[in-house]
Amino acid sequence: MVLIQFLTGFFYLYGKRLFSVSKVMDMICLDYYTILPAPLAMMLAARVKNYDLMKKLHEWEIPVDYALLVVDDVPTIDYCLSLGANSPTRAQKRRLLRDTTFNPVYKYLMNCSGFPTKREKNIPCDVQCERLQKTIIKELVFNCSVLLEMILLSEKEYAYALHYAAKYNQLPILMYCWQQSTNAESILLKTCCSDKNINCFNHCILYGGAQNLNAAMIEAAKHDARMLINYCVMLGGKSLNEARETAIIFGHIECAQHCSRLQSYVMRD
């Protein structure tokens, strides 16, 4: 809940959302900074030119060198140098960026905030940012869910994150995105069934309740997810006929036969 409240305050920088200075200050200086990778905390503070926060992080022995990776204005660079930062060489930058936890966010800040790479200079900024958002959602969102509000800007992006949260069984992210996406139930069912993912499926039933078992069986039949059909029947699902017909429509003959066998067992009981 603290995180959700924290994420309510942010402002726009170069057309992209970032945390408000006060909220970054509140979060990090109240010992919540451990949620963020330490280098990323310094980067964000530098990006919003919060010198007080940079100094506080520096006192906590978080290297100010990281700030120089994401700033290009003279006052901020001078401030970093006054704190003892060394302008990173190429080799040092490679070393600093070896931490894959915050590497996608670094790329996001650089490419979406006025620092396109040489290779991408001719690619429109909005296209670059869309690609990087997908990278972040895939690679980072599961390590640092506090950044969700910063990078998810639309219903479509929440749906995308929900899909990956379900795919990789990331329950905290699934819970957050579930609240933001109007199509959450359908996305979860499709993801769980297509990946034949029983843990994801459990979350789906947990959120949607037993009334979704019949819809889940039909969705499972579309993907030949026989294990999930078995699971639905065990929990009280009643749509075996519909599941069998769906399996036939989608060309899953063995799945249709499986549904018929299950139907005979259920009727026998």
UniProtKB/Swiss-Prot annotation:
What family does this chain come from, according to its entry? Belongs to the asfivirus MGF 360 family.
Q: Which UniProt keywords apply?
A: Early protein
Native organism is African swine fever virus (isolate Pig/Kenya/KEN-50/1950) (ASFV)
Q: What does this protein do?
A: Plays a role in virus cell tropism, and may be required for efficient virus replication in macrophages.
Q: What induces it?
A: Expressed in the early phase of the viral replicative cycle.
Q: What is this protein called?
A: Protein MGF 360-15R
